[in-house]
């Protein structure tokens, strides 16, 4: 079974308390705490897309079976929900559905009365003041993203200055086995200038960056990354690292600094002269999903 039974709770570290804040949610995946204490949550699953020809049908069949067994199969609710704990007792007594027409939403960011939501293939901006109970209109598209086949979640982080938005897009494949052409615009972090609308690749070679945040001390962007599979139970470590502008972390050709993945059949680009080593190894296959 997935989760905890009635009356059961996760074990908390000494000095901390864990309680059930909300339940009855249809596959919640990402959370955003707003400055007024409201919590936004996406209810979402992978998009149903035509993946076309090619790929590894047996791998996809097994993966689909495992996802369904874990509760990740089925249709996406496509909802953005607001949870409100008005009396501060640690339990959300208020629940409002702000949107139910999104498309496999995941990333959420808020700043300057604007709410940013990442569908699997785009980033939308909505007018939203703190304390609001509605999210009206269609939203302004501020960026297109590679559609959500493969790694479909799209994490967002707003720069502390409020003028740039960062969007993480994972790879479609494990090590580019289906061709590097389909990996265009993937395995990277986009920087979106909110004043001009221009996009640039901020960091690349990141197989599946699944958490984004800025250090309150250095101001640097940090991320947690899910690394490649099928090299055994001891490789490759997922990692936590800072992301300097223009950096490359090696995917798919190299992992963890200077280890070449001989399975990759596509030649390494000549322009890739330096691969950065991640700051902290988290262990293989731990699948860190937030930061």
State each model region's role:
Residues 34-37, 110-113, 158-162, 213-218:
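Residue-level detector of Asp-centered blade-edge/turn motifs that repeat once per structural unit
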Residues 18-22, 94-99, 140-145, 198-203, ...:
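A short beta-strand motif characteristic of beta-propeller blades
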Residues 91-114, 119-161, 171-174, 198:
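Asp-box/WD-like beta-propeller blade repeats and closely related beta-sheet repeat scaffolds
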Residues 1-13, 48-77, 153, 171-177, ...:
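Beta-propeller domain segments
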Residues 83-89, 126-134, 243-250:
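Short loop/turn segments immediately following beta-strands, especially the blade-tip
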Residues 40-42, 117-118, 166-168, 222-225:
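Residue position within the beta-strands of beta-propeller blades
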């Amino acid at each position: 079974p997935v989760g905890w039974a009635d009356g059961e709770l996760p074990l908390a570290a000494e000095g901390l308390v864990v309680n059930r804040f909300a339940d009855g949610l249809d596959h919640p995946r990402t959370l955003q705490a707003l400055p007024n204490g409201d919590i936004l949550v996406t209810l979402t699953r992978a998009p149903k897309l035509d993946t076309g020809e090619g790929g590894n049908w047996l791998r996809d069949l097994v993966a689909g079976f495992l996802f369904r067994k874990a509760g990740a199969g089925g249709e996406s609710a496509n909802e953005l929900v607001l949870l409100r704990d008005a009396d501060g007792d640690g339990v959300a007594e208020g629940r409002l559905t702000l949107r139910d027409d999104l498309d496999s939403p995941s990333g959420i960011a808020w700043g300057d009365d604007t709410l940013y939501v990442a569908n699997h293939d785009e980033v939308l901006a909505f007018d939203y003041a703190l304390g609001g109970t509605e999210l009206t209109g269609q939203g302004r598209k501020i960026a297109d993203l590679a559609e959500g086949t493969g790694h479909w979640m799209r994490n967002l982080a707003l720069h502390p200055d409020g003028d740039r938005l960062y969007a993480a897009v994972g790879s479609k494949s494990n090590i580019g086995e289906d061709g590097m052409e389909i990996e265009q615009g993937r395995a990277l972090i986009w920087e979106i200038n909110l004043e001009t609308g221009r996009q640039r690749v901020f960091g690349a070679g990141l197989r599946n960056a699944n958490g984004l945040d800025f250090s309150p001390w250095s101001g640097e962007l940090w991320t947690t990354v899910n690394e490649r599979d099928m090299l055994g139970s001891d490789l490759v470590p997922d990692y936590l690292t800072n992301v300097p502008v223009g950096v490359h972390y090696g995917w798919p050709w190299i992992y963890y600094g200077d280890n070449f993945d001989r399975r990759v059949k596509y030649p390494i680009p000549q322009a890739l002269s330096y691969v950065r080593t991640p700051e902290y190894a988290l262990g293989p296959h731990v699948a860190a999903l937030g930061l």
